[in-house]
């Protein structure tokens, strides 16, 4: 699931134009340039039929987008929301943006602030036996 999610974000032209390779699971490396994305798996839910596991992994992923300017944070947020809103692909049965939160933190940015938007995205992955 981790590789699938990151690769989808890296392959999207709008997201890649804003974030480049700055998409990381759990934590960003020290001194990473802004804007950047940090992904966290919040939860995973399985569903079953009378015949067993339905083969779909329902992953709630928090995507935190950080930027040194408010405009950069909004641009990244819009691109990532557009990507995940209703996405269906070969490995993804569906993706849905559920919550969006904006915060501001103290940092060494141009105005002394670090802008963050947190997106909660439900990503339903088609599980295979080789994952």
Language model region names:
Residues 41-42, 60, 100-101:
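Solvent-exposed, well-ordered amphipathic alpha-helical segments
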Residues 50-56, 108-112:
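Short, solvent-exposed beta-strand/turn "edge" segments of beta-rich domains on protein surfaces
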Residues 55-69, 73, 80, 115-126:
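Oligomerization/assembly interface segments of phage tail-like spikes and tubes
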């Amino acid at each position: 699931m981790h590789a699938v999610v990151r690769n989808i974000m890296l392959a999207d032209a709008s997201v890649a134009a804003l974030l480049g390779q700055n998409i990381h699971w759990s934590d960003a490396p020290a001194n990473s340039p802004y804007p950047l994305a940090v992904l966290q798996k919040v939860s995973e839910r399985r569903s079953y039929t009378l015949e067993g596991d339905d083969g779909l992994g329902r992953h709630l992923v928090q995507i935190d987008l950080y930027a040194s300017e408010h405009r950069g944070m909004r641009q990244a947020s819009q691109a990532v929301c557009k990507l995940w809103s209703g996405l269906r692909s070969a490995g993804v049965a569906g993706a849905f943006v559920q919550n969006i939160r904006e915060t501001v933190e103290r940092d060494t940015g141009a105005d002394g602030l670090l802008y963050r938007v947190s997106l909660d995205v439900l990503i339903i992955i088609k599980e295979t036996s080789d994952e």
